[in-house]
Amino acid sequence: MDIFASHAFDWLVVLLLFGGAIYTLKIIGEEKTTFKEESYQVQFGNLVLEIPRWWTITEQDEHHIKFERTDTRYDWFATFSYFPDHQGKTMPELLEDKLNLENIEYDMDVVFETDSRVLFRDSEIQEQFQEVIRVEGKGSQDQIERIYYDIYLMRALNDHGYFIFESKSSVLNGSLEGPFFEESLACLSFIHETQTGKA
């Protein structure tokens, strides 16, 4: 009993951390079941994004939207960006430019996908975005910071521009928002006159 009494503060810290972990797991578990019911639509150009209700828009202009979790403190953000001119570069060249700009180097074991039929559910999106590259996995930024990075580069048929959609977090947080980012893009669709919910 003396051991517990002499380390009461230490035990209190352990119990608080344990309680916080259980609470976080409970919230995340609820989020996974409520994504479809409680997501909202955000208009981005001629696209409609399905966004989880717990993502907050922290930056927005005509060609860029940034989402963050303002209800938690963990290190994560997602950006959806459109660049009007690809300057004659191929998708692999654009990917290389982006990774060099951000000073990101992936580990060897990454997910790599170029088939729009695998990435998107909507048949119009699959047809229009036949040029797509997705890379997901762990890596390093600035040769120091360990990150989990998921990036989609997409170009529509007959479009001189291209999209970059990215999700970046610490390695430990990569599995928290990553599935929702992937689901958001899997649900990507074009705006139709009957759709509402613009942001």
Which ranges hold each PLM region?
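Short, compositionally biased strand/turn segments
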Residues: A21-Q41, K168, T194, K198
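Long, highly charged amphipathic alpha-helices
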Residues: E50, L94-D97, E183, C187
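N-terminal "mature-domain start" segment
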Residues: T33-H64
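Surface-exposed amphipathic alpha-helical segments
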Residues: W55, D159-A199
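Conserved polar/disulfide-associated segments of primarily extracytoplasmic proteins
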Residues: D2, T58-I164, N173, G197
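N-terminal signal-anchor transmembrane alpha helix of single-pass membrane proteins
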Residues: M1-K32
